[in-house]
């Protein structure tokens, strides 16, 4: 049977091209724990020096990711139960960073690569939606709404992270194609709700702050 278009695209991105540095690069983009220290430092700096807009952005971002993870992504994973590529295809390559301390050393080490194993497939699949893709596009959407074109630049790393999830064998191309726009739509809806709540509740709860900032998301 000929492979589906989804499988063809998967094999194109997941293929071994004889360039270990490319596998390492994709694994770096795909690894949350590699970037976590930098994200924490950036978040603390924005909370400290970012003013009202920066703190509002962080609050909206954390709320949105929490709501999406707990209320949408995880429930959908259990409901859809789509198996990851490496639980379906023995030809799939699973590419991960080496387990190093400190974590940044993994970026200069060869990645750990193994073949897919359908025999290890769990009872409940977790391929759709892609949590990494959803969270990154949520991040990019929030930044764009708060910082306009400067924030929109974050769609570049968000796209690279999404592609890396396919290149490292964790997701099908269709997973990220559905997760990215879905995340943008949900995030925009949540931001609209946050803005309405601020306009409705802030004058009563924090009147002084509401006078200075009548809108949660002010024009850039």
Where does each model-flagged region fall?
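Membrane-helix interface segments
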Residues: 21, 52-57, 146-153
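Hydrophobic, aromatic-rich alpha-helical transmembrane segments
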Residues: 21-24, 54-59, 169-173, 177
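Alpha-helical transmembrane segments in multi-pass membrane proteins
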Residues: 60, 64-69, 73, 97-99, ...
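Hydrophobic, aromatic-rich transmembrane alpha-helices
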Residues: 39-49, 136-144
């Amino acid at each position: 049977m000929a492979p589906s278009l989804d499988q063809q695209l998967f094999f194109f991105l997941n293929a071994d091209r004889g360039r270990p540095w490319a596998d390492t690069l994709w694994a770096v983009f795909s690894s949350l724990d590699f970037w976590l220290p930098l994200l924490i430092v950036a978040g603390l700096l924005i909370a400290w020096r970012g003013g009202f807009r920066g703190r509002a952005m962080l609050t909206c971002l954390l709320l949105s990711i929490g709501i999406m993870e707990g209320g949408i992504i995880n429930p959908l994973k259990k409901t859809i139960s789509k198996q990851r590529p490496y639980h379906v295809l023995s030809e799939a390559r699973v590419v991960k960073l080496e387990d190093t301390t400190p974590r940044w050393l993994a970026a200069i080490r060869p990645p750990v690569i193994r073949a897919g194993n359908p025999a290890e497939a769990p009872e409940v699949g977790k391929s759709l939606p892609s949590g990494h893709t959803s969270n990154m596009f949520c991040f990019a959407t929030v930044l764009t709404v708060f910082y306009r074109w400067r924030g929109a630049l974050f769609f570049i790393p968000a796209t690279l992270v999404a592609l890396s999830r396919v290149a490292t064998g964790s997701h099908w191309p269709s997973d990220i194609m559905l997760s990215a726009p879905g995340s943008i739509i949900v995030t925009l809806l949540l931001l609209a709700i946050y803005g309405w709540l601020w306009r409705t509740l802030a004058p009563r709860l924090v009147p002084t702050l509401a006078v200075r900032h009548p809108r949660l998301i002010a024009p850039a």
